[in-house]
Design a protein with these regions (language model features):
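Short N-terminal "domain-start" leader segments
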Residues: 1-26, 35-39, 44, 56-86
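Solvent-exposed strand-loop boundary residues in beta-sheet-rich modules
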Residues: 31-33
């Protein structure tokens, strides 16, 4: 057992890879406060704007985005255009 309380997410965002031609990414807010989602979207796009999903920097920035979402209590869903294996 852990003493960590898991709070419900404040918002949900989908991060979608659009393809190899810029812009590569789009972020859609599914639910939650609009300002929270807009600020999160701005940070996500700043990290991904010039990266394709195959760029080595993408993996590091993806982990940073996941940590940011956890801090902000935003659940995220990635659509990279292929099935991911964990």
């Amino acid at each position: 057992m852990t003493d960590i309380a898991t709070d419900a997410p404040r918002a949900h965002a989908r991060i979608i890879y659009l393809g190899p031609v810029s812009p590569h990414w789009e972020v859609y807010g599914e639910y939650g406060e609009r300002t929270v989602l807009e600020e999160f979207r701005t940070r996500v796009l700043a990290r991904l704007v010039l990266l394709t999903r195959d760029d080595p920097q993408f993996r590091r920035n993806r982990e940073r985005i996941v940590r940011d979402a956890e801090r902000e209590r935003i659940s995220i869903e990635w659509d990279l255009g292929y099935a991911e294996s964990d």
